[in-house]
């Protein structure tokens, strides 16, 4: 957005109904602010904070015919990119706070759910059941769940459903291979 747009100027019609243009700009700015520390330069201590596979590094250097400087630069980029993916997850998750009846719990609170949606009038599920609360587990992409996290997520949902018969649990992929609304049947 240009500065005039962020200050309330209306260069284009704002189409999103659940969030004002001003709040959207603030949300984007908060996400960009999270990138901040990752842009600081790397020293050897910071570089070694993550465990690096030296064997893979040697293979990659040889196969890609790269210099050590290029390999270190690539590793720094990889580490930053991994952290930035978490920040994009923050963007996906916390934008729900602007949607009516949605609540984004603090990290690790309220059962560790990413989003909780409540509607006193009830929410009709595709099978016809009506519940008043939906617990959401969000994943950035379809490939972010390995078998361990699939099992953990399934057990978390199963536990919630056993303790609250007036709810449903949804697994939401922010960036899915294709848009779908299906029952999740994990293989654990």
Language model features: what each stretch is:
Residues 106-107, 126-127, 159-163:
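Short, conserved, surface-exposed binding loops centered on an aromatic residue
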Residues 100, 114-145:
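Conserved catalytic cores of phosphodiester-cleaving nucleases, focusing on short active-site segments
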Residues 1-91:
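Interdomain/boundary linker segments immediately adjacent to catalytic/signaling cores
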Residues 108-113, 147-149:
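Basic, glycine-/proline-tolerant helical and adjacent loop/strand elements
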Residues 140-188:
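Catalytic cores of nucleic-acid endonucleases
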Residues 83-108:
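Short N-terminal edge-element motif at the start of the domain
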Residues 7-11, 117, 185-188:
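Short, intrinsically disordered, charge-balanced linker/junction segments flanking boundaries
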Residues 33-47, 132-154:
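Generic detector of solvent-exposed, compositionally biased contiguous segments
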């Amino acid at each position: 957005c240009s500065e005039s747009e962020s200050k309330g100027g209306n260069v284009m019609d704002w189409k999103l109904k659940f969030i004002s243009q001003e709040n959207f700009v603030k949300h984007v700015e908060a996400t960009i602010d999270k990138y901040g520390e990752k842009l600081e330069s790397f020293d050897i201590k910071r570089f070694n904070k993550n465990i690096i596979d030296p064997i893979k590094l040697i293979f990659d250097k040889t196969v890609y015919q790269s210099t050590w400087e290029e390999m270190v630069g690539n590793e720094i980029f990889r580490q930053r990119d991994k952290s930035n993916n978490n920040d994009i997850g923050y963007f996906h998750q916390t934008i729900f706070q602007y949607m009516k009846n949605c609540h984004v719990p603090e990290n690790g609170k309220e059962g560790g759910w990413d989003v909780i949606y409540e509607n006193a009038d009830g929410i009709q599920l595709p099978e016809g059941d009506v519940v008043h609360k939906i617990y959401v587990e969000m994943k950035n992409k379809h490939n972010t769940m390995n078998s361990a996290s699939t099992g953990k997520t399934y057990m978390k949902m199963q536990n919630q459903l056993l303790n609250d018969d007036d709810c449903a649990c949804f697994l939401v992929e922010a960036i899915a291979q294709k848009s779908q609304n299906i029952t999740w049947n994990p293989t654990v």
